[in-house]
Regions:
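Nucleotide-activated donor-dependent transferases that construct or modify glycoconjugates
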Residues: 1-12, 37-38, 58-61, 72-81, ...
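Short N-terminal targeting/anchoring amphipathic segment
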Residues: 5, 96, 102, 153-172, ...
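Conserved catalytic-core segment of nucleotide-activated headgroup transferases in glycan assembly
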Residues: 15-24, 242-342, 413
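Conserved N-terminal ligand/cofactor-binding loop architecture of enzyme catalytic domains
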Residues: 33-152, 313, 331-334
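Active-site-proximal region of nucleotide-activated glycan assembly enzymes
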Residues: 53-54, 124, 135-150, 167-173, ...
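Acidic donor-binding loop of glycosyltransferase active sites
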Residues: 161-163, 337-348, 353-367
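Catalytic binding pocket for nucleotide-activated donors in carbohydrate/polymer assembly enzymes
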Residues: 206-209, 231, 368-445
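C-terminal amphipathic helix plus adjacent low-complexity
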Residues: 268-271, 336-338, 408-476
Length: 476
């Protein structure tokens, strides 16, 4: 029986690949070993998996060098994706420059940003070190100073694996080192791209895996144009997170989370004035006589908010028709804080289908939850205007959203003044037919008659078969 190594390098992969049944078909058909970063907040949970084979460690100094190289490559290749530039603007805290207020106050914010960006390891030093004169020298020195992780090397060299699989956001040292080890040991590597924007928002691979599993056709094109993969290296897999949305379409309706009709407002990890927008939405509901009197707003802030210029703390006492999402409220009651990231909190995916399905309309800044809402056949309003605080969250930087306007019921709100009219239209939206919606969303997310575990097993079999064929043909 072929032996496969699966490496888990982030807590979110514990939720997306271990808590789901993503690996179930592999576990039935192959001898599977799962290893994980021992510093994970959910490391103990991983160790309880029947396929668990051990932990590996990541040296902080080495990780910093990897991340510096990733950021230099991001800047160097920024013309390949507008989101690369956005990432640098965000990392350098560009949004902290004030665009409103007295001139002196705005000028001082610029000076303050320059000082902070000079000290920030992700700030001004990135474009300097990635400049044409310095990049070849600096990147070469960094690559030579990055040996393969010894723990990963030990796992790969002592266990004679037939294949190595790893989920990745395309911005981690583990994927680089496993790709290098695979080449050294003649073991095929399969990288599972985890999220929608990963191929256009992080960096470019400086050591590519042999094969890559992506969400859909859009990501396939990005893998070729941004990262230089060949068509033969790319497999359309989808994501294990979303199988439940398609299953929920035909399943009996579950008990509703809320007894009242609601507009769902989903927050973004990226900075956006969500509290101000909630006030605006509440005023719209209260001033429009055509809106049902019992229609409320459920606010689901992103659990891993980044620092923002606008108020971020939701206080129910400031609203009359807005309720905090129950799952997030429970997390806040347990200690989760706005504008902070707690990797141990990984929201249960089973909560999402009914939350999205039961919403009258879903509204929010540009976040993957809007795409998930479209999969649940809900009308969606994507807020793509300048919110008055954060100038770099506009639609022009989020290339993965290109084409979403073709999805039935999905609209972009490019001006705050249009929100009322678009909400009115969304509330009057005719029922969205699954077959019509799927025709458009399938460009972003591959869909067929198989589940994600079945597709992953099918792709793995194809990779193993092609590797055996290549080995036979290479023999004298």
């Amino acid at each position: 029986m072929p032996r496969i190594l699966v490496a888990i390098s982030a807590d979110i992969y514990v939720r997306n690949y271990l808590r789901t049944d993503a690996l179930s078909s592999l576990q039935k058909q192959y001898d599977l070993d799962i290893i994980a970063d021992k510093s994970l907040a959910l490391a103990n949970e991983v160790s309880q998996d029947p396929s668990f084979a051990g932990f590996f460690s990541l040296a902080p100094d080495t990780e910093r060098k990897h991340h510096l190289l990733f950021n230099l490559l991001m800047w160097r290749h920024r013309k390949k994706s507008r989101t690369f530039l956005y990432r640098w603007l965000r990392n350098s805290q560009w949004h902290l420059i004030k665009r409103q207020g007295p001139l002196l106050e705005r000028a001082l914010s610029v000076v303050s940003w320059i000082v902070k960006a000079s000290r920030n390891p992700h700030g001004l030093r990135i474009p300097v070190l990635a400049s044409a004169p310095l990049f070849p020298l600096v990147s070469g020195l960094l690559r030579r100073s990055l040996p393969v992780n010894p723990d990963l090397e030990k796992f790969v060299t002592t266990n004679h694996y037939d294949m190595i699989v790893f989920p990745s956001a395309a911005f981690d040292s583990v994927s680089v080192d496993l790709s290098r080890l695979g080449r050294q040991r003649n073991v095929p590597t399969l990288c599972l791209i985890d999220n929608w924007d990963n191929l256009t928002s992080k960096t470019v691979f400086w050591k590519k895996p042999d094969f890559i599993g992506v969400w859909g056709e859009q990501a396939r094109q990005q893998a070729m144009s941004v990262h230089g993969f060949s068509a033969e290296q790319i497999h359309l897999l989808g994501t294990p997170r979303f199988d439940s949305y398609f299953a929920a379409r035909d399943a009996p309706e579950e008990e509703r989370h809320y007894e009242f009709p609601y507009v769902l407002f989903v927050g973004s990890a990226m900075p956006f004035d969500e509290i101000g927008t909630l006030h605006a939405l509440e005023r719209i509901l209260e001033s429009d006589p055509s809106v049902p009197a019992n229609l409320r707003i459920v606010y689901r802030p992103h659990p891993w908010q980044q620092k923002r210029n606008s108020p971020a703390v939701f206080d129910s006492r400031d609203f009359s028709r807005v309720d905090l999402d129950l799952q997030i409220k429970a997390a806040f009651d347990a200690g989760l804080e706005p504008e902070k990231t707690d990797p141990a909190f990984q929201p249960e995916l089973g909560y999402y289908p009914s939350l999205l399905r039961d919403a009258e309309v879903v509204i929010g800044p540009l976040t993957t939850m809007l795409f998930e809402s479209a999969l649940c056949l809900r009308p969606v309003i994507a807020l793509s205007y300048f919110d008055g605080y954060h100038p770099n969250t506009g639609r022009r930087y989020f290339v993965h959203f290109e084409g979403m306007e073709r999805v039935p019921g999905f609209t972009f709100c490019n001006r705050a003044s249009d929100l009322h009219g678009q909400l009115r239209s969304a509330l009057d939206q005719e029922t969205i037919r699954a077959e019509v919606s799927d025709t458009q969303t399938s460009y972003f997310l591959f869909q067929d008659h198989l589940s994600y575990p079945e597709r992953l097993a099918q792709v793995s079999a194809s990779v193993l078969k092609s590797e055996k064929r290549a080995t036979r043909t290479s023999k004298p």
